[in-house]
């Protein structure tokens, strides 16, 4: 009989899904832990046979390295959660509460991620609060990528905007340190960044090896914007911040069959292999273009549901071999910064999708988006109770 008081007595932890950080996940799974060290992983039945004296603990759920929050907005962590259609949510929620976007809010969000034991973060730093970047770069308990957000719909102002953004990025990159957050760039969306600025930013990022994130194909109303140049997004825009027509923003006439993904591809932006956020309302041709470019995508299941965006076509992206990661988006639209809640919600949205695929995406997919590496749960490695997703 195993002595429960013996610190070297083996424990057999069994779960519904095990992902060790290598290969694919398995279900069910188990981990044998001896004295704070992983002794074995694998099928529970095989582990019972190999370690008959181990004390078994049915922990259920998931055993895996901590999940990565691959897309969020930490400086919105003091916003109130509000569910509204996407095209109303920005003018009615984001803009009126913009005074809440601050260093204090971002640090509060970073504290929350630390307390959650997050495996890393892809954070969008608000363009008009650059001091947030300085504050987050200094955090020693934060890893991942801090993407400086760029907006600007007027093509004739693109060069001046680009110079300012480049100067800031170059200063921040000098503050990077081993093990700390990296600096990235996020041209907000194809319809809030002019064609000229979008191309300048993405060409620069590609040349400098800067990680990129772009919000793309989030809401169904984007289809009307790119095919007709109008619709709810255009009707609810903040008019002083836009030229007279949408055609001026994208540098071409809207037309039937034009999608945000096709527009970015034909503009040359996908050559920079940006990570594409949301990608809910896409066509089969869009998916082919993304796969050909080698871009990864991040899905934010709860946020997409709350903003009435639709359901991410996960199976189609998986079939095309596209890397998928998960993010919470901001607390204002997602509800919390705990990406494990998005994993659980994704399992309800995609009942026919193997849950092992979703767990792997939350870990391996997130690390691949951020250019980092997940810790491994394997023989000889230190055991961490944070590997139990509760």
Language-model segments: what does each one mean?
Residues 125, 186-202, 216, 220, ...:
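Active-site glycine- and acidic-residue-rich loops that bind
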Residues 140-144, 204-211, 269-272, 289-298, ...:
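Glycine-enriched alpha-helix->loop->beta-strand junction motifs that scaffold or abut catalytic
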Residues 233, 266-270, 312-390:
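His/Asp/Glu-enriched, well-ordered alpha-helical/loop segment
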Residues 1-50, 372, 388:
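N-terminal metal-binding scaffold of metallo-dependent hydrolase/deaminase domains
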Residues 46-64:
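Active-site metal-binding motif and surrounding structural segment of the metallo-beta-lactamase
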Residues 65-77, 211-220:
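Histidine-centered catalytic micro-motifs
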Residues 77-105, 145-148, 220-271, 346:
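Active-site gating loops and adjacent loop-to-helix segments of metal-dependent hydrolytic enzymes
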Residues 62-63, 80-142, 163-178:
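Alpha-helical scaffold segments that flank or form the walls of functional sites
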